[in-house]
């Protein structure tokens, strides 16, 4: 009996974002869950300075060698006068059937890698260039959500150009007394601050500007419940059961420390028991947002539910984490899809979307041409 050819997957992780180490954790978990009888996997670590390491070098890091040491040994092998040097190891990879990006934050979620895969004419897991870019920018996301009448929080955008006009008094009048400050193009709660007075606002804004030149200042929902929904699919996506995150009362929100440093005080309710109508509303809002943004493959949709039961869509993550405490895979597990089966479906969805896009003709043929 002839052995079926394995699918050759190129997995990229790391990157030059503040979520570099988070990405490495996600990649380990995905790799461990993949069926090695079905997949041949090449690993590509993107270093903190944006260089793609070879599979051999990446596996050294994957197996526990200090990343800085491996990078120091590999860099002299690259001819940095070559404009393609940062991605040289990727272009040399042979017979990759599909790319699986596990790069959180910029490069991975902002459409950059997706554009590279498109240039390479290769299938890939997840959303396309435009959908990734629009979803990564919280301002653009909220504009699209608002256009489609999907409830989200009030906000203003602060930039270096209008910073002097965006005083705390102005924001109190236009947004509210209690504020959340967020870099527009970051994830995993990087650079996010809650502000309830002018000094907290000024300090939070100064820190947020370290991570982006466009800052969202949003209204803060009083005592919200943080609820998440996982989406899976392409043109006909499906929504998972919902999960809730309960943070310690001493913390004001589910921040980077809660997520990745010390999660000991955080509890999860999976699935969460909410009124049936609220559950359906959140699931439908998640699906509506997924479609409005043109997403493909997967997304985790985060909500804040107010004390009176109103859901506000907070963020959409197009390459959600797969760490040990990440809710995207956990919600599918409680919805009946195992970790390994979930990865299988994501890879197949990548192939399906590539085929769909391949059917589009970009060459122009005149109507009267023979």
Swiss-Prot record:
One GO BP annotation of this record: regulation of cell shape
Binding site residues for Mg(2+) 1: 302, 315
Pathway assignment: Cell wall biogenesis; peptidoglycan biosynthesis
One GO cellular component term noted in the UniProt record for this chain: cytosol
Entry GO MF terms: ATP binding; D-alanine-D-alanine ligase activity; metal ion binding
Pfam families: Dala_Dala_lig_C, Dala_Dala_lig_N
Cofactor field: Mg(2+); Mn(2+)
The keyword Nucleotide-binding is assigned to this record: yes
Enzyme Commission number: 6.3.2.4
Keywords, in A-Z order: ATP-binding, Cell shape, Cell wall biogenesis/degradation, Cytoplasm, Ligase, Magnesium, Manganese, Metal-binding, Nucleotide-binding, Peptidoglycan synthesis
Subcellular location: Cytoplasm
Catalytic activity entry: 2 D-alanine + ATP = D-alanyl-D-alanine + ADP + phosphate + H(+)
Domain ATP-grasp: 142-348
Annotated ATP binding sites: 172-227
Textual note on the cofactor: Binds 2 magnesium or manganese ions per subunit.
Class of the enzyme per the UniProt entry, highest EC level: ligase
Keyword Nucleotide-binding: yes
Domain of life: Bacteria
Chain sites annotated for binding Mg(2+) 2: 315, 317
UniProt record similarity statement: Belongs to the D-alanine--D-alanine ligase family.
PANTHER family cross-referenced by the UniProt entry: D-ALANINE--D-ALANINE LIGASE, D-ALANINE--D-ALANINE LIGASE A
Protein task: Cell wall formation.
HAMAP family associated with the record: Dala_Dala_lig
Name of the protein: D-alanine--D-alanine ligase
């Amino acid at each position: 009996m002839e052995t079926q050819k394995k699918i050759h997957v190129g997995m990229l992780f790391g990157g030059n974002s503040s979520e570099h180490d988070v990405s490495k954790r996600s990649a380990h978990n995905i790799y461990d869950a993949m069926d090695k009888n079905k997949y041949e996997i090449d690993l590509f670590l993107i270093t903190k300075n944006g260089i793609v390491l070879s599979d051999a070098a990446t596996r050294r890091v994957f197996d526990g060698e200090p990343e800085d040491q491996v990078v120091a040994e590999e860099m002299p092998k690259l001819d940095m006068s070559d404009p393609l040097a940062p991605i040289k190891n990727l272009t040399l990879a042979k017979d990759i059937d599909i790319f699986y990006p596990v790069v959180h934050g910029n490069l991975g979620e902002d459409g950059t890698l997706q554009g590279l895969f498109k240039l390479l004419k290769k299938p890939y897991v997840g959303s396309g260039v435009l959908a990734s870019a629009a979803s990564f920018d919280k301002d653009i996301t909220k504009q699209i959500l608002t256009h489609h009448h999907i409830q989200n929080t009030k906000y203003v955008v602060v930039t270096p150009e209008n910073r002097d006009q965006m005083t705390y008094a102005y924001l109190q009048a236009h947004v509210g007394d209690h504020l959340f400050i967020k870099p527009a193009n970051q994830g995993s709660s990087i650079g996010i601050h809650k502000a309830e007075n002018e000094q907290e606002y000024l300090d939070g804004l100064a820190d947020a500007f370290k991570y982006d030149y466009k800052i969202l200042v949003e209204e803060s929902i009083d005592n919200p419940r943080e609820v998440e929904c996982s989406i899976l699919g392409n043109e006909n996506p499906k929504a998972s059961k919902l999960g809730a995150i309960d943070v310690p009362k001493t913390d004001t929100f589910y921040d980077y420390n809660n997520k990745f440093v010390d999660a000991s005080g955080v509890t999860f309710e999976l699935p969460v028991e909410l009124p049936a109508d609220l559950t359906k509303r959140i699931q439908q809002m998640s699906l509506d947002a997924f479609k409005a943004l043109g997403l493909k493959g997967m997304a985790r949709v985060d909500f804040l539910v107010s004390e009176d039961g109103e859901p506000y869509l907070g963020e959409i993550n197009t390459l959600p984490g797969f760490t040990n405490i990440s809710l995207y895979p956990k919600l599918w597990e409680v919805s009946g899809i195992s970790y390994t089966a979930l990865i299988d479906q994501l890879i197949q969805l990548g192939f399906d979307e590539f085929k769909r896009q391949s059917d589009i003709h970009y060459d122009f043929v005149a109507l009267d041409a023979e």
